[in-house]
Amino acid sequence: MISRYEDDPEYHKYLENNDPYGIMTMSALWGADSLTHQNRFSGVSKVYGIDVSYYQGNIDWKKVKNSGVEFVIIRVGYRGYGSAGTLVEDPKFKTYLDGATKAGLKVGVYFYTQAITTAEAKAEAKFVLDRIKGYSLQMPVYYDIESV
């Protein structure tokens, strides 16, 4: 299984995480003093959301909704490492999209980009648009741009 995901840029972040499963629970975030904001945001409403990819495993979307989460950003896919730069759909993308939608969560998507040329960026955009065609998203499409 590991070799299947070695080309996935997020897999390496997952392995480096101190948590053995790469997950922080909502209860950990909402603990007594663990979630704070600067005073300039006093009086501003907080909206809770999560982003998910294959590494979160099977998700009980009803539990997510009941925990107070209002939106979810789901990874559509990523560009693999190396010269091939293969565009890969997240194995859980459609399952997560269907489950989150059925649970009544607002849904958006993200793509983990490794594009280094305009042509690659355009190919990634087409890849995303092809996969979200026919779905009704309530949140934007995001591009996760990180140096790896």
What are these regions (language model features)?
Residues 42-148:
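Substrate-binding cleft of extracellular glycoside hydrolase catalytic domains
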Residues 1-75:
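Boundary/entry segment of secreted carbohydrate-active catalytic domains
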